[in-house]
Design a protein with these regions (language model features):
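Histidine (H) residue identity feature
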Residues: 2, 16-19, 28-31, 125, ...
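Long, charge-rich alpha-helical interaction segments
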Residues: 1-35, 39
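General structural signal for secondary-structure boundaries
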Residues: 19, 44-48, 273
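Histidine-centered catalytic/metal-binding microenvironments
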Residues: 24-184, 235-236
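A broadly tuned preference for mixed-charge, low-complexity surface segments
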Residues: 1-5, 84-92, 116-132, 237-245, ...
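Generic signal for short, ordered secondary-structure residues
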Residues: 16, 48, 55, 80, ...
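Extracytoplasmic
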Residues: 164-167, 175-443
């Protein structure tokens, strides 16, 4: 979790509050970490508990609590902006996190090991605004207005707002993706809303989830592709409090016969975890190997044994990724790497990329003029941002026709760690911290 973003430089806008469900996923992760830490603590003998608290429990749980503080603040601000009564619930959750942070820190200083390490956790660890803790601050909350009357407010997954009328669309469903999306029916009044959801097509499934504040009802929408032979569009009608909103559903049936490990474009995006390659080609005894559970989402790939640079694009060991492009046009390939530095002084971190049978071109994870280990001139901000984000990006523009294409990633600089690839149609990428959820893939 701390490898995603350090707690002291996490803010309400770090993780996107709606896109790709990443704030909700982070909230779930924080609660899971807290439960794991509590479970282990309950199994330890008394003589081991002080060491466990100082070395494991406090870093994990206090860090997760700071993350939650910011995630709840983001929910509060978003709900308040659109008049959702649940904004006040999340403002209260932020207050609870602040109180819990004080309790955890006080226990570390005053009670753990009979106060042996008193003062060790007095330094600020929330909301840094500079490189140090000067002018640190708690995340801000908004005391949104709560209506006296029921009012339906609908939010569809990945959208940027709640609406009380008109139409919204869920992201596409694909026959290879097993996607499920969240549909929320919220109330401007602090009360449970009597909501009616109807859909005339039996291939659309709607299931209510038992989670969230009382003024927000959460529904999981999925598609049963066993009932479809071709791409279909449908509509969910959401009705409550004399309001109605139409929710568009598109179920895409992939009819092409595709090679194994081919990713399918969805809403103009193909997102691929690095370990899900179609081919792994070694060179001179060097090959890409998987680093399990290292990286922002799933894992990472790195060339071993280390120590060899390949200065000519395309001559190093390679990973290949197969993609189905459903709409031809201009695309951007973003390659997400760990924020590693070159193992040799004076060199930048590089890889090479080619498409299909085209020639390979060199890509740097940070432009030379913006690469400066240890900080320095403001032009080095890209490198510095990579430290905070714990990743660097390389981007390549390409024109692709409709159909199946192969992306080849070649090693150039020893030590490069590949985490994720995102191919996006021009204008279709949404703002997010982790990037899009992995696309559906043929296995």
């Amino acid at each position: 979790m701390h490898g995603n973003r350090r707690p002291e430089v996490t803010y309400p806008d770090t993780y996107h509050v709606t896109h790709y469900g990443e704030s909700s996923k982070m909230i779930h992760l924080c609660h899971r970490i807290k439960k794991m830490a509590d479970d282990i603590d309950g199994k330890l003998p008394e003589e081991a508990k002080a060491s466990y608290y100082g070395l494991v429990y406090y870093p994990a749980v206090a860090g997760a609590n700071v993350q939650l503080m910011n995630l709840y603040a983001a929910k509060n601000q978003f709900y308040a902006k659109y008049g959702v009564a649940a904004a006040k619930d999340y403002a209260e959750k932020v207050k609870q996190c602040i109180t819990y942070d004080e309790e955890l820190t006080n226990y570390y200083n005053k009670e753990m090991a009979d106060g042996k390490w008193d003062g060790m956790m007095l330094s600020a660890h929330i909301g840094f605004t500079h490189w140090n803790d000067e002018d640190w601050k708690y995340p801000e909350t908004v005391q949104g207005a709560v209506s006296d009357e029921d009012k339906l407010l609908v939010h569809a997954a990945d959208s940027d707002c709640f609406v009380s009328e008109g139409e919204v669309s869920l992201p596409e469903f694909t026959s290879v993706g097993e996607e499920t999306y969240l549909l929320q029916a919220a109330n401007a009044k602090d009360a449970l809303l009597d909501v009616i959801l109807t859909c005339e097509d039996d291939f659309v499934s709607i299931r209510e989830l038992s989670c969230g504040p009382q003024s927000v009802r959460n529904f999981e929408v999925s598609v049963d592709f066993s009932k479809l032979t071709e791409t279909k569009e449908s509509e969910i009608l959401v009705q409550a409090a004399s309001c109605e909103v139409k929710v568009k559903v598109k179920a895409v049936v992939i009819t092409e016969k595709l090679p194994s490990m081919t990713f399918v474009e969805r809403d103009g995006i193909v997102s691929m975890e690095a370990e899900h390659f179609a081919a792994n080609e070694s060179k001179d005894g060097k090959e890409w190997k998987c680093l399990k559970e290292y990286g922002k989402t799933l894992s990472s790939m790195k060339v071993y044994p280390m120590g060899t640079n390949f200065d000519k694009p395309g001559e190093g060991p390679s990973l290949s990724y197969s993609v189905l492009i459903r709409e031809g046009g201009e695309y951007t390939l973003r390659v997400i790497t760990a924020p590693t530095n070159s193992l040799e002084d004076g060199r930048n971190m590089r890889y090479a990329v080619s498409f299909d049978d085209g020639s390979a071109s060199e890509v740097k994870t940070v432009l030379d003029e913006r690469y400066n280990i240890g900080g320095g001139h403001s032009r080095a901000r890209d490198w510095a941002e990579g430290v905070l984000n714990n990743c660097h990006y390389g981007e390549t523009k390409v024109t692709l026709d409709k159909g199946v294409h192969t992306i080849h990633i070649y090693s150039m600089e020893s030590g490069l760690v590949l985490q994720k690839l995102v191919l996006s149609h021009e204008g279709d990428a949404k703002e997010s911290y982790f990037g899009p959820t992995e696309s559906g893939v043929v296995r």
